[in-house]
Amino acid sequence: MNNLIDMRQFAKSAGTNIIVKAGNEVFHRGDNGACMYIVQSGTIEMVIGETVIETVGPNEAIGFMSMIDTQPRSSTARVKEDSELSVIDQRTFRFMVDEVPNFALYIMGVLARRIRGMSAVMSE
């Protein structure tokens, strides 16, 4: 993804970093969302049921919609290959929105791409 900023370095220092092995889920559709994740390395599939809506990789955010609207997770994040993720809590997310240049544009870009991806899947 061609982002305005590379969030990995900031997220790695601002968040808690975890390793998730292939085949595991980061979160499940319907879960309450208290954090978001920035993918440092690896690949995550965003799925609804068994339909892959999107595949995300390094420098991409997942789980951020729950930071914006406090609604449950809208999809399941399934790890396709071993991944390192930076966990960003609500407080850090708000700080990033307020203080990190271009972060809001970064999130809007991810949202736009996700909407386009879902539209493409639905039209198939």
Segments predicted by a language model, with ranges:
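Cytosolic regulatory regions built on CNB/CRP/Popeye-like sensor folds
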Residues: M1-E124
